[in-house]
Amino acid sequence: WSKIDIDVCGPLALQRCLIVYPWTQRYFGSFGDLSTVAAIMGNPKVAQHGVVALTGLRTALDHMDEIKSTYAALSVLHSEKLHVDPDNFRLLCECLTIVIAGKMGKKLSPDMQAAWQKYLCAVVSALGRQYH
């Protein structure tokens, strides 16, 4: 995590997710104009939520032995109030991995990527737990 700039990678990951998977935009109706790539890339609410999402993702590091309970409230919020399709967590994590790979280049070794993917899978599972 020390190599990840949350203020840069968070917005880039969410922007990429909204552009590559446009159906994910339906959960962000209150964010204003998301009609074009330029609108998404310049939207301060998208950028802010990207930081929030990555900050939340970072929380799991401090609670590795209790990831599911750490994300229990967020799981309930996203499933029962926001009605977010849990597959969107996976899509966002895929976009985040691409952003991080772009930033780190060759420094992101296969072993590091494997550990990163395992971490993300645990968090995505915890966030989707309420849906099961």
Curated annotation (Swiss-Prot):
InterPro entries: Globin (IPR000971), Globin-like_sf (IPR009050), Globin/Proto (IPR012292), Hemoglobin_b (IPR002337), Hemoglobin_oxygen_transport (IPR050056). Heme b binds at residues 49, 78. Belongs to the globin family. The keyword Transmembrane does not apply. Hb 1 is a heterotetramer of two alpha-1 and two beta-1 chains. Hb 2 is a heterotetramer of two alpha-2 and two beta-1 chains. It comes from the Eukaryota. Red blood cells. Involved in oxygen transport from gills to the various peripheral tissues. Keywords: Heme, Iron, Metal-binding, Oxygen transport, Transport. One of its GO terms (cellular component) is haptoglobin-hemoglobin complex. The gene is hbb1. The lineage of its organism: Eukaryota, Metazoa, Chordata, Craniata, Vertebrata. GO terms for molecular function: haptoglobin binding; heme binding; metal ion binding; organic acid binding; oxygen binding; oxygen carrier activity; peroxidase activity. This is Hemoglobin subunit beta-1. Residues 1-132 form the Globin domain. The keyword Acetylation does not apply. It holds the Pfam family Globin. GO terms for biological process: hydrogen peroxide catabolic process.
